[in-house]
Each structure stands twice: as C-alpha cells, then as structure tokens.
From Swiss-Prot:
InterPro entries: BEX (IPR007623), TF_A-like/BEX (IPR021156). It comes from Mus musculus (Mouse). Residues 1-55, 106-128 are annotated as: Disordered. The histidine cluster (His cluster) and Cys-125 mediate zinc-binding. Belongs to the BEX family. This is Protein BEX1. Primarily localized to neuronal cells within several regions of the brain, including the olfactory epithelium, bulb, peri/paraventricular nuclei, suprachiasmatic nucleus, arcuate nucleus, median eminence, lateral hypothalamic area, thalamus, hippocampus and cerebellum (at protein level). Expressed in brain, mid term embryos and to a lesser extent in ovary. In testis, it is expressed in the pachytene spermatocytes and spermatids but not in spermatogonia.
Length: 128
C-alpha cells in the first residue's frame, strides 16, 4: 500500500512540476507573437533581418517616410533649408550673370572693328 501511495505522490509531484514549467513557458510565448519568417530572394529592397541569429524576421518597410519628411518642412530645420536654397539660388544667379557678361564682352571685342587697345593678354597674333 505504501509503495502505491508513494507512486501516486511521485506522479502528482511530476504533474505539478510539468504544469509549473508550462505556466512559465506561456508568458514567453505570448511575448513572441510574431511568427518566424525565413528571408527569400523575393523579400524586397526594404526588408532586412532583425533580432538574433536564430530567428530571421522581415522588417516592415516605412510606409509614410516621404510624407513624414514633407511634413517636417514646417519645423525650424526645414525653414533653414528653404532659406539656404533661396540664398544659394541667388548666389548662383549672380555668378551666371557675371559669367554671361564676361563671355559677351570677349565675343564683342573679337567682332568689333576697333583696333585693340593695350590689353593683349587675351589676344593671340602670329604675324611678325
């Protein structure tokens, strides 16, 4: 009788131990709800592995990335960018005007019938 009682106690203890282990494993399973997905060649350009080496998960692409950047124009950094673009645009415009004036002055000097004055540094003559 005693051996049967001990056998029953041992079984009960083993069952209790297994139930405790199952309870400890359940919270970990609820934390890891995402299914493991293996990367394929069709994964796309926006996907990359994340996490440990054992599991490979596909990182979700950023859907509203460009929209978010466009909304940031109202922030101080965006306003600074707009001011810089305007300033640099004005500088480039001035440089282009100066370059155009110089090119026109040189071309007009070559076409004009006036005798050349004392700036011979840009003219070339092969006559002796």
């Amino acid at each position: 009788m005693e051996s049967k009682d001990q056998g029953v106690k041992n079984l009960n203890m083993e069952n209790d131990h297994q139930k405790k282990e199952e309870k400890e494993e359940k919270p970990q399973d609820t934390i890891r709800r995402e299914p493991a997905v293996a990367l394929t060649s069709e994964a796309g350009k926006n996907c990359a592995p994340r996490g440990g080496r054992r599991r490979f998960r596909v990182r979700q692409p950023i859907a509203h990335y460009r929209w978010d950047l466009m909304q940031r124009v109202g922030e101080p950094q965006g306003r600074m960018r707009e001011e810089n673009v305007q300033r640099f645009g004005g500088d480039v415009r001035q440089l282009m005007e100066k370059l155009r004036e110089r090119q026109l002055s040189h071309s007009l000097r070559a076409v004009s019938t006036d005798p050349p004055h004392h700036d011979h540094h840009d003219e070339f003559c092969l006559m002796p």
